[in-house]
């Protein structure tokens, strides 16, 4: 019996050893399979997804802008058939042309033309302005309060005022790029160049000898005249200056521009003061109207009370 028990114990011990031997390699292989799995996983980086999303949004934005531009270009050439097909619309803005009535429509800006289209009671109203004919572009305030307008003056003294512009500054910048023959005369206007470019001024070394020669020639001419002529005034030195075109020093134009820019803030301050005074007057008138209406309402209520008291106090008529 003891031998059998020992035999069973040895067999159990051997079986346990075999089981442990089989389980050990399995446990050693498990982390090896897990590690490469962790290494193969891509890093959780949100920047890649964000960049892909931003690229998609940019592509959508550009595609929308391209479709809108092509759509406006087709509308532009459909409405204004006299404009050549080579003209491409640079900007389209919704605005209103100020006339007897406000004509709401769209302003089409192209490299050589400024075109406005509006429809009133089924009738098309079109305005075509060549860029070359524009002489002045000035920022305009609607009713002297709302800074949402632009005034365009042509060489035929025709003035067009466009108001209700949502982005007046962007339209102004676009017109400044298109109208290359204009220059900024102030912060709020573009005007044509009043002083054309003069020829290069001659050096004083060339002018001074010529002036001396003229003076020398004028002196003997006055001596050779007959005595019958009593008095002949000599040619003044200023006459030599009149022979030459007036040339301003190079810094004079810069000084004039500085003076114009200094005068502009003063006019802005005057306009602001005038606007503030106007607002004060309007506010006082509104207060006066409110007080007068409240006083009239009070008087009406008192009269109603008096009428009610009189009607209750009077005796009722008896039936005969």
From Swiss-Prot:
The keyword Manganese does not apply. CDD domains: PH-GRAM_GRAMDC. It is a single-pass membrane protein; Peripheral membrane protein. Residues 33-56 are annotated as: Disordered. The chain crosses the membrane at residues 278-298. GO terms for cellular component: endoplasmic reticulum membrane; organelle membrane contact site; plasma membrane. GO terms for biological process: endoplasmic reticulum-plasma membrane tethering; regulation of store-operated calcium entry. Keywords: Cell membrane, Endoplasmic reticulum, Lipid-binding, Membrane, Phosphoprotein, Transmembrane, Transmembrane helix. GO terms for molecular function: phosphatidylinositol binding; phosphatidylinositol-4,5-bisphosphate binding. It is found in: Endoplasmic reticulum membrane; Cell membrane. InterPro entries: GRAM (IPR004182), PH-like_dom_sf (IPR011993), RAMD2A (IPR042624). Residues 74-141 form the GRAM domain. It comes from the Eukaryota. Phosphorylated. Signal peptide: none annotated. Pfam families: GRAM (PF02893). Participates in the organization ofendoplasmic reticulum-plasma membrane contact sites (EPCS) with pleiotropic functions including STIM1 recruitment and calcium homeostasis. Constitutive tether that co-localize with ESYT2/3 tethers at endoplasmic reticulum-plasma membrane contact sites in a phosphatidylinositol lipid-dependent manner. Pre-marks the subset of phosphtidylinositol 4,5-biphosphate (PI(4,5)P2)-enriched EPCS destined for the store operated calcium entry pathway (SOCE). GRAM domain is required for specific location to endoplasmic reticulum-plasma membrane contact sites (EPCS). Mediates interaction to phosphatidylinositol lipids and binding to plasma membrane. This is GRAM domain-containing protein 2A. The gene is Gramd2a.
